């Protein structure tokens, strides 16, 4: 227990993040299955819309703050950044431990918020006046706000740690332009966290005082404006979605270049600039989430254009990945299957994003299932596919064990069918006008909702199969004899698994 509770070792802390993220992911998945069960047939299943919206809200918060971010930034980030930099550990190892241990209390607060009063049925955006005292009396929303505060502090500390580590602890020979793309993606992610989370903290703190201390930041009766909250929230919320996908970009770059048998990713400097551009542009497009609140036409025109510009650096990344794959004799290993699935499905999600960027079109599609389909393509098939690819790719390094390849391929096929069956029909529902965040719908929408629910059941079976595959690997203890990877990235020069202290002597990189 002492080793895990007080650990200052980036590998142990990374492992804790993985376990925590997997556990939270199971909770979040259970909530999503409840959502799909409710929508699997017309009529009610679990009760009124309040409980339904509590489930939807908790599903979003858990998947974002307690599954994707801990696994990508906490798990892969902690494990790989020091190894790829040739650094003995993170810059602030004890703060690293604290970043992790802020998360279980944060998750507990969120779960408790669902259990007191009527729960926080606000949606993950927590818009007032629905989230204000007038519509959500009781402590639920307050507890959810405190949960976000803790998760936010955790992420800010982690971000400071990663930025400091990369600035100060690069090994001799690793200049910024030669730094691995995954490390770049984590640094840019950390910068985004550092700049956006304080704004969220301000917004939810003002909401807290509106609810409890009689201020009126968001209450028109006292001269406030609920639209101010939306601006503040989305100034955080839009960078947040890039925070969720950028580490995935970094992992996919590594996996594609290694599986292609290439020395490096095509256009790696361009890839770095593309990620920097995405990070910068992510901060100046937030109001595209607010096309329906009545902004001036010139404001809408700006946010439409700026949003579409993000497609350019994203396109650079997609085509560079395709160029990296070009001309290779691929063996379809499980990791490359996930990476190829990522490139294809993330592109589909990106295309629906360009559709939604048009303010005039978005007036019709806003708050319909078209939006749900869009962001689940980039999250459930972008972020999650990247996590799967990365986990399978680096599992032999992390554990020194092998997974069952045949099963992993079957698992990929099951998941691929499941997620597409779940989310592709939601585009049709959205175009037909089915609104989000309702527990019931007119009968005309039944067919595609049934298809979607069947898809979610298939995905659930896939996830359970994945946990079985990991269990089987840990029980069988098939040791890795040597890493099959080309050593295009220095983490593969480690033992499998790496020693507790990887670089007691600092490496010198010459190339």
From Swiss-Prot:
Catalyzed chemical reaction(s): 4 Fe(II)-[cytochrome c] + O2 + 8 H(+)(in) = 4 Fe(III)-[cytochrome c] + 2 H2O + 4 H(+)(out)
Cellular compartments annotated: Mitochondrion inner membrane
Cofactor: heme; Cu cation
Chief site of localization: mitochondrion
Keywords noted in UniProt: Calcium, Copper, Electron transport, Heme, Iron, Magnesium, Membrane, Metal-binding, Mitochondrion, Mitochondrion inner membrane, Respiratory chain, Translocase, Transmembrane, Transmembrane helix, Transport
Cofactor binding note of this UniProt entry: Binds 2 heme A groups non-covalently per subunit.
Gene Ontology cellular component annotations, sorted alphabetically: mitochondrial inner membrane; respiratory chain complex IV
Entry binding sites for Fe(II)-heme a: 59, 376
EC primary class: translocase
Positions annotated to bind Cu cation: 238, 288-289
InterPro entries the UniProt entry points to: Cyt_c_oxase-like_su1_dom, Cyt_c_oxase-like_su1_sf, Cyt_C_Oxase_1, Cyt_c_Oxase_su1_BS, Cyt_c_oxase_su1_dom
Amino acids binding Mg(2+): 366-367
Pathway: Energy metabolism; oxidative phosphorylation
EC numbers, comma separated: 7.1.1.9
1'-histidyl-3'-tyrosine (His-Tyr) crosslink residues: 238-242
Keyword Electron transport found: yes
GO MF terms held by the record: cytochrome-c oxidase activity; heme binding; metal ion binding
Pfam family for this entry, one: COX1
Family: Belongs to the heme-copper respiratory oxidase family.
Record-given protein name: Cytochrome c oxidase subunit 1
Organism encoding this protein: Drosophila mauritiana (Fruit fly)
């Amino acid at each position: 227990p002492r080793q895990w509770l007080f650990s200052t070792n980036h590998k142990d802390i990374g492992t804790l993040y993985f376990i925590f993220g997997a556990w939270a992911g199971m909770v979040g998945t259970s909530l999503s299955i409840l959502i799909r069960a409710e929508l699997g047939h017309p009529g009610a299943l679990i009760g009124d819309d309040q409980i339904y919206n509590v489930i939807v809200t908790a599903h979003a918060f858990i998947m974002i703050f307690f599954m994707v971010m801990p696994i990508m930034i906490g798990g892969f980030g902690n494990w790989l950044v020091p190894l790829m930099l040739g650094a003995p550990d993170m810059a602030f190892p004890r703060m690293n431990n604290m970043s992790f241990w802020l998360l279980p209390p944060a998750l507990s607060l969120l779960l408790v918020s669902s259990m007191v009063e009527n729960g926080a049925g606000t949606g993950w955006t927590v818009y007032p006046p629905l989230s204000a005292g007038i519509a959500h009396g009781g402590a639920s929303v307050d507890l959810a706000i405190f949960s976000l505060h803790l998760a936010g502090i955790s992420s800010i500390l982690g971000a400071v740690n990663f930025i400091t580590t990369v600035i100060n602890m690069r090994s001799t020979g690793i200049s910024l332009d030669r730094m691995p793309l995954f490390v770049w993606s984590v640094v840019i992610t950390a910068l985004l966290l550092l700049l956006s989370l304080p704004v969220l903290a301000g917004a939810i703190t003002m909401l807290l005082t509106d609810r409890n201390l009689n201020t009126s930041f968001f209450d028109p009766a006292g001269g406030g404006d609920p639209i101010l909250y939306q601006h503040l929230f989305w100034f955080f919320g839009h960078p947040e979605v890039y925070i969720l996908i950028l580490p995935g970009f970094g992992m996919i770059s590594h996996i594609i270049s290694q599986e292609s048998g290439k020395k490096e990713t095509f256009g790696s400097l361009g890839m770095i600039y593309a990620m920097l551009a995405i990070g910068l542009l992510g901060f100046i497009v937030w109001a595209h989430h607010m096309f329906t609140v009545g902004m001036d036409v010139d404001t809408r025109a700006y946010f439409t254009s700026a949003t579409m510009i993000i497609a350019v650096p994203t396109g650079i990344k997609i085509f560079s990945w395709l160029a990296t794959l070009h001309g290779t004799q691929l063996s379809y290993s499980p990791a490359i299957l996930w990476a190829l699935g990522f490139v294809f499905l993330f592109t589909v999600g990106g295309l629906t994003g360009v559709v939604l960027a048009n303010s005039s079109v978005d007036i019709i599609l806003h708050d319909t299932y078209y939006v749900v389909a869009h962001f689940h393509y980039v999250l459930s098939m972008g972020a999650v596919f990247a996590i799967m690819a990365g986990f399978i790719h680096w599992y032999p390094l992390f554990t020194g064990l092998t997974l069952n390849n045949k099963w992993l391929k079957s698992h990929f096929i099951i998941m691929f069918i499941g997620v597409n069956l779940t989310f592709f029909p939601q585009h049709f529902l959205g175009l037909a006008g089915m609104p989000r965040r309702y527990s019931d719908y007119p009968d005309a929408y039944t067919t595609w909702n049934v298809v979607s629910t069947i898809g979610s059941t298939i995905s659930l079976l896939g996830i359970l199969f994945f946990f079985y595959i990991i269990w089987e690997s840990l029980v069988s203890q098939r040791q890795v004899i040597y890493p099959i990877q080309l050593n295009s990235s220095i983490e593969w020069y480690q033992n499998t698994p790496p020693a507790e202290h990887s670089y007691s002597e600092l490496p010198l990189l010459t190339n």
